[in-house]
Amino acid sequence: MATILDKILVEKEKEVKKLIGQTFNQTAVRKPKKTFKQIIEEQNKMGVIAEIKRASPSKGTINADVDPVQQAITYAANGASAISVLTDYPFFKGSIDDLKAVREVVDIPILCKDFIIDKVQIDRAKAAGANIILLIAAALDDTKLKELYEYAKEQQLEVLCEVHDEEAMERVLTLKPEIV
C-alpha cells in the first residue's frame, strides 16, 4: 500500500516533467538582510520558522482562506526568524505564487517548503525569491540527496534537511549540513 509520501512523490515526478525545459527569471525581489543561519547565531537562541499552510494530507483543510501576504507580515512583525511557504498544490493547496507574493513584502529568509526531487524545482524556488529550500531525507536516496544539496549550495541557497529517524539523520550528517 502506497504511503502519503509515495503518492506525493508520484505527483512531484509529473510536476518535474512539466517544469523541465522552462527558464525561471528572477525578478527584482526584496532580499533578506541576513541568512537564517546568521539570524539564529546572532539571537543565540532557537529561531522560529513560521509556516503558511492551507491544508495537509493528514489534517485536511487548515486555513483555506489564508492571505499569505498578510500572514507573512504578521509573522515578520512578531519576530519570526524565517517564513515557510508551502508551494505544493495537490496536497497542501499552496503555490509558487504564494512564495513570490510573500517575498515582495518581507525581508527575512523564506523557506520554499515542497518535496524537492529535481534541480529544476530549486531553480524555480530561487527565482521566486526563496532563500532556503527543504530536502526531505525520506524522499531521496543518498545520491540524489547529495546532488540536490550541493546544487542548492552552489545557487547560494540555504538548505534545511528534514529527518524523521536516526538512520535519516546519519545519512544527512554526511553532507555536513548547517540546518537540520
What name fits each language-model region?
Residues 134-136, 140, 144-157:
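Conserved catalytic cores of soluble enzyme domains
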Residues 102, 124, 151:
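Hydrophobic/aromatic ligand-binding patch that stacks against planar heteroaromatic rings
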Residues 1-110, 117, 142, 156-178:
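Conserved N-terminal beta1-alpha1 strand-loop-helix module at the mouth
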Residues 77, 127-128:
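Flexible glycine/serine/alanine-rich "lid" or loop that lines and gates the nucleotide-sugar donor pocket
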Residues 87, 108-121, 127, 133-137:
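Glycine- and Gly-Pro-enriched alpha-helical subdomains that act as flexible
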Residues 131-132, 179:
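Bateman (tandem CBS) regulatory domains
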